[in-house]
Every structure is written in structure tokens, then in C-alpha cells.
Regions:
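Catalytic cysteine-centered active loop of the rhodanese-like fold, especially the PTP/DSP P-loop
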Residues: 50-98
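Short amphipathic alpha-helix with an adjacent loop that forms part of the alpha/beta core around
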Residues: 17-21, 47-56
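Conserved beta-strand segments of alpha/beta enzyme cores
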Residues: 29, 40-42, 85-87
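Flexible, polar/low-complexity N-terminal or interdomain linker segments that lie immediately upstream
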Residues: 1-39
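Active-site regions of enzymes building and remodeling cell-envelope glycoconjugates
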Residues: 38-48, 57-60
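Residues at the C-termini of beta-strands that transition into short coil/loop
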Residues: 34, 45-47, 90-92
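Active-site neighborhoods of enzymes that stabilize oxyanions during catalysis
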Residues: 100-102
Length: 102
């Protein structure tokens, strides 16, 4: 069983955990907080009303340019979405490797 009580996932953890959780029927969503999409990654733009529409228990992985901004805002995200899991993408958009796969 995956530990979902962590603050950050690396890109490889995100990709592996996304696959494992989706096999269990859990939605894992990459959330763009900077209006700057990651090339080759499927993500939604941060929009609280839209995010709240996801099923309870969904996992949101928030990213910014460096990962520091979303990491520092985790308390805010978790209070806004108490029925969802909120995690920050370590290194953010800057550390994303387009060709990385697991």
C-alpha cells in the first residue's frame, strides 16, 4: 500500500504511483498552479471549483516552477480540499524530464 501522507513526490514516484493508484480506481491528477503546462504531461489548471468536482479520495499533485511554492502551500491546499490527498511535485516543472518513464 502506498503512503499517501507524504508532502512530495518525485516525477518517477508520481508516474509509478499514478499507475498503481489508477489500477485501484483512484484518480491521480497533476495540477498546474503557474499557468505553464509541462510538455507531454496531462495536467489541469488550478481552479478550486473544478478540483472539488473530482471524487473524494482523489490525489492532486500540485506543481510550480521549482516545487518550493507548492510545497509551502500544501497546508492551504489541504484545508481547501480536505476530502482529497494533496502532494507537491518535487522540483516542479524545472525538474520534469519529458522522456522519463517507469
Amino acid at each position: 500500500m502506498l503512503d499517501l501522507h507524504v508532502d512530495e513526490w518525485t516525477q518517477s514516484e508520481y508516474l509509478a504511483n499514478k499507475r498503481a493508484l489508477e489500477l485501484q480506481g483512484v484518480s491521480v491528477v497533476l495540477v498546474d498552479t503557474i499557468l505553464n503546462p509541462i510538455q507531454g504531461a496531462e495536467a489541469i489548471t488550478y481552479n478550486p471549483p473544478l478540483v472539488r468536482e473530482y471524487p473524494e479520495g482523489s490525489v492532486f499533485v500540485f506543481y510550480c516552477d521549482s516545487g518550493k511554492g507548492t510545497h509551502s502551500r500544501l497546508k492551504e491546499f489541504r484545508s481547501k480540499f480536505p476530502h482529497h490527498i494533496c502532494i507537491s511535485l518535487r522540483g516542479g516543472r524545472g525538474y520534469w524530464r519529458r522522456n522519463l518513464s517507469v
